[in-house]
Regions:
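Short acidic/polar capping segments at secondary-structure boundaries
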Residues: 107-110, 151-155, 196-198, 228
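Metabolite-binding pocket within alpha/beta catalytic cores that recognizes anionic/polar moieties
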Residues: 2-4, 8-20, 27-38, 63-128, ...
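Short catalytic helix/loop segments, enriched in acidic residues and glycine
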Residues: 36-54
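A secondary-structure boundary/capping signal
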Residues: 23, 106, 149-150, 193
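N-terminal structural subdomain of ketosynthase/condensing enzymes
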Residues: 51-65
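SIR2/sirtuin-family catalytic core signature
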Residues: 1-21, 27-29, 89, 97, ...
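Active-site gating loop/helix substructures
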Residues: 121-186
Length: 321
């Protein structure tokens, strides 16, 4: 799926927790509503359903027909339908990698459900953030932020972002998450899947990215799309994205087969200082410590030569975390 040189760059950044993920409805297609029967719809299917509900032409965009919904319809068709969902195989693969941050155009909670179901195996804990929340960086890599750009079914009081007016409003600098995404998408490594490059606000974000704007010391940015057309291929060239023709679950399965299991957070973050920690101290407590403080290397000479490395007082304090 990738050239050896691109795969090597991807591995270095992915296994260091440098990759961001941007996903759309396509990654939730094998997830189900809470009745465990009806699968979650694609954006196109959902738009057609709402058009039929409001008795308008089926070619009306979702952004327009959404404005016709009354509060009860919003509760039934969006909030209840997309909350307490059952995660499918695709989103269940995401927690097996370490991500810098996850952005999603989806309002469903399938990804959160995947992290919850696999808490004993997930590389990180998840922290959900709705589009209306103030910007806050994650305190440590042990928590991955899932930023819901269009709203979140578990927080219906904040509303949903489907109208063209709201798209324009939320693509301006007054919304911190939109601003952060537009800035980081231009330079940092991203894997994008489950969404069309013609998504209204995605076009805005990509306008900040060119074929040469990505950082050369990080992995390549990738669009995973099973059925790209000529326009998609051209857009990838313009924005410096590598196009992978596959489903997202196929791509993640291929990565696991090629690269093996991603390293643990403990391996990435913790320096090698055997004997400093109490043996019973959980790994996440060690990670919290090293992502909350600066490591000061010993500089005083010891009586026997070399540097003094008496960590006994540190060991006592860490054992109390």
């Amino acid at each position: 799926m990738l050239k050896a040189s691109d795969l090597a760059r991807l591995k270095a950044s992915l296994f260091a927790g440098k990759y961001n993920l941007l996903i759309g409805a396509g990654v939730s297609l094998d997830s189900c509503e809470k009745n465990a029967i009806d699968r979650l719809p694609s954006g196109w299917e959902f738009q057609k359903h709402l058009c039929a509900l409001k008795n308008v032409s089926s070619d009306r965009p979702l952004s327009r027909v959404y404005q016709l919904l009354n509060p009860k319809e919003i509760e039934k068709e969006l909030t209840r339908r997309f909350s307490n969902t059952i995660p499918g195989d695709t989103v269940k693969k995401i927690p097996h990698f370490i991500w810098n941050r996850i952005y999603t155009f989806n309002i469903d909670d399938a990804l959160e459900g995947a992290y919850g179901e696999q808490r004993d195996f997930a590389k990180q804990n998840s922290s959900s953030i709705n589009f209306n929340k103030p910007y806050a960086s994650s305190s440590s890599h042990k928590d991955v932020q899932i930023v819901h750009l269009h709203g979140y079914a578990r927080e219906p009081e904040a509303g949903y972002v489907f109208s063209q007016t709201e798209y324009a409003f939320n693509s301006k600098a007054i919304n911190p998450w939109m601003t952060v995404l537009s800035q980081t998408l231009g330079t940092e490594p991203f894997i994008i899947s489950g969404t069309s490059l013609s998504e209204p606000d995605l076009e805005y974000y990509l306008s900040h990215r060119t074929a040469v704007s990505g950082r050369q010391d990080r992995g390549p940015s990738i669009l995973v799309e099973p059925s790209p057309d000529a326009i998609t291929e051209n857009d990838c060239k313009r924005h410096g994205l590598i196009l992978v023709k596959a489903t997202f679950t196929e791509f993640l399965s291929w990565l696991q087969a090629e690269l093996g299991d991603a390293p643990s957070l403990e391996t990435i973050i913790l320096p090698s200082i055997d004997g400093v920690f109490d043996k019973a101290l959980p790994a996440l407590s060690k990670i919290s410590f090293f992502t909350s403080v600066d490591i000061v290397r010993p500089a005083l000479p010891s009586a026997g030569g070399g540097n003094c490395q008496d960590f006994s007082s540190v060991r006592y304090q860490l054992g109390k975390i």
